Amino acid sequence: MKTYIPKKDDIQRKWYVVDATDVVLGRLSTEVASILRGKNKPMFTPNADVGDYVIVINAEKVKLTGKKLEQKELRHYTGYAGGLKSITYKDLMQKDPERAVTHAIVGMLPHNSLGRQMAKKLRVYRGADHDHIAQNPEVLEIK
C-alpha cells in the first residue's frame, strides 16, 4: 500500500474564528498552530500545507500567566551595532496586541518557507470585528 499524498484539488480549507478572551496565550497558540499546520485532518502531511484559515479576535484580552507581562521581552535586531531593540509584553499588549499573539503563534510553526506559507492563513484582530464574514467561519472553542 502506498502512502497517500494530498494534491491541491483534494485539500478542502475551512475558516475558523477563535475568541482569545481570557485564554492563556500559550494554549491559544498551540491550538491555532496545530490547525494552521493541518494536524487535525486525516490527510496531514508534514511536507505539504493542508491547514485551515484561522481568525483570532479580541487579541487584547489574551492572558499571560505569572510575571510574563512584566518580565518577558520581545526582541529584534536592526542590523546596526547596538541595535538590539526590546519591548516588554506589558508595553506590547497596550501598543500592538495583534503582534504579540501573531509572534507566539508563528513561533510554533515550522521555521522555513512552508511555515511562512502557513502563517499567511492567520488573521489576528483587536476587538470582536473582523472582515471575513463572507467565508462563514466556524467558531472554535479553546479553554
Swiss-Prot record:
Pfam families given in the database record: Ribosomal_L13
InterPro entries: Ribosomal_uL13, Ribosomal_uL13_bac-type, Ribosomal_uL13_CS, Ribosomal_uL13_sf
GO biological process: negative regulation of translation; translation
UniProt signal peptide: none
Coiled coil feature spans: none
Keywords: Ribonucleoprotein, Ribosomal protein
GO molecular function: mRNA binding; structural constituent of ribosome
Top-level taxon: Bacteria
GO cellular component: cytosolic large ribosomal subunit
PROSITE patterns assigned to the protein according to its UniProt record, in alphabetical order: RIBOSOMAL_L13 (PS00783)
CDD domains with a match to the protein in the record: Ribosomal_L13
Function comment: This protein is one of the early assembly proteins of the 50S ribosomal subunit, although it is not seen to bind rRNA by itself. It is important during the early stages of 50S assembly.
Subunit and partners: Part of the 50S ribosomal subunit.
PANTHER family named among the record's database cross-references: LARGE RIBOSOMAL SUBUNIT PROTEIN UL13M, RIBOSOMAL PROTEIN L13
Entry's family note: Belongs to the universal ribosomal protein uL13 family.
Name under which the protein is recorded: Large ribosomal subunit protein uL13
Organism name: Finegoldia magna (strain ATCC 29328 / DSM 20472 / WAL 2508) (Peptostreptococcus magnus)
Gene name of the record: rplM
